[in-house]
Amino acid sequence: MRTVYHQRLTELAGRLGEMCSLAGIAMKRATQALLEADIGAAEQVIRDHERIVAMRAQVEKEAFALLALQHPVAGELREIFSAVQIIADTERMGALAVHIAKITRREYPNQVLPEEVRNCFADMAKVAIALGDSARQVLVNRDPQEAAQLHDRDDAMDDLHRHLLSVLIDREWRHGVRVGVETALLGRFFERFADHAVEVGRRVIFMVTGVLPTEDEISTY
């Protein structure tokens, strides 16, 4: 009976990895939509998010069924409770990609981003997408050290976001308040996508070790 139970836990972990992969694909397409004013890519991100939402409902149902099925021991409880948190993080990652796609669609056929911030956004997107891919990988291999590296790699996103804000508040900014606010909001979406990927890594550490590290502790793994 426990063998079957553990098999279902393994299947649950696989579904989490699939959700994370879908969120990463959504962010890649949202970035393409944003940087290239690609309305087709934007529409696909918005349309495909329904699949992530449906998966969240199904995977949550599976997780709670595993809680009710037997009396899970400590390690199994960690897996299930971590899974519930990771489900929320990955769904939110997909939702952030949708926000980017919707802004792109609203402004189409115009380019959303002023020229002086386009390179910054391209770099932010690279970091966000790479962190999403790494989050998916740590869900598969459950390596606490690799999971902890997500936190360190997020520093690049923080630096890029600070640079973006410095451009927006500079007296040389000539695109007005509305564009400035919209650009800041888009930057925040990329930053939050990366934050959720880091949180997936933190939950994997807890799943494996039984310790949920603080921001200061995570680099010790």
UniProtKB/Swiss-Prot annotation:
Q: Where's it found, cell-wise?
A: Cytoplasm
For this protein, the record's Gene3D superfamilies field holds: Phosphate transport system protein phou homolog 2, domain 2 (1.20.58.220)
Primary location recorded for the protein, binned into one broad class? cytoplasm
MF (Gene Ontology):
protein homodimerization activity
Q: Which UniProt keywords apply?
A: Cytoplasm, Phosphate transport, Transport
Q: Which GO terms describe its cellular component?
A: cytosol; plasma membrane
Q: A Gene Ontology biological process annotation? A: phosphate ion transport
Q: Which Pfam families does this entry report, sorted A to Z?
A: PhoU (PF01895)
As for what it does, the entry says: Plays a role in the regulation of phosphate uptake. In this role, it may bind, possibly as a chaperone, to PhoR, PhoP or a PhoR-PhoP complex to promote dephosphorylation of phospho-PhoP, or inhibit formation of the PhoR-PhoP transitory complex.
**Family to which the UniProt record says this protein belongs:** Belongs to the PhoU family.
Self-association state and partner proteins as the record states: Homodimer.
Name by which UniProt lists this protein: Phosphate-specific transport system accessory protein PhoU homolog 1
**What's the source species for this entry?**
Mycobacterium tuberculosis (strain ATCC 25618 / H37Rv)
